[in-house]
């Protein structure tokens, strides 16, 4: 089990430095299947697509993601439809990735394994 599951997202209002690429790769090893991408503004994001058998399962998963996100005070961008859900996570206040993003990713993965 990832040590990230035992942590809580810390409120972030900016003022901290986003992870550099070596920190990102270190933390990426702690969350399975999450891809890293960088947008046109050079901001890093975590990205993962989850596959389901139908719309109802996708919706149930997204509702659970919403509950965890509210509990953690850290909110991903979510796209979903019939048989899939796509989650994108970043720390908007610092325009990059922080430990919060990986904590949330680990907790989202726990929904699937539960």
What are these regions (language model features)?
Residues 1-56, 60-114:
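Long, contiguous binding/interaction regions
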């Amino acid at each position: 089990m990832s040590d990230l599951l035992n942590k809580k997202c810390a409120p972030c209002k900016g003022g901290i430095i986003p992870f550099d690429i070596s920190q990102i790769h270190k933390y990426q090893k702690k969350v399975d299947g999450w891809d890293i991408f960088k947008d046109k503004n050079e901001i890093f994001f975590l990205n993962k697509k989850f596959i389901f058998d139908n719309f109802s399962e996708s919706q149930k998963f997204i509702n659970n993601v919403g509950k965890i996100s509210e509990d953690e005070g850290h909110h991903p961008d979510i796209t979903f439809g019939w048989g899939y859900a796509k989650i994108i996570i970043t720390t908007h206040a610092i325009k990059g990735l922080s430990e919060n993003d990986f904590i949330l990713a680990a907790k989202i993965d726990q929904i699937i394994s539960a």
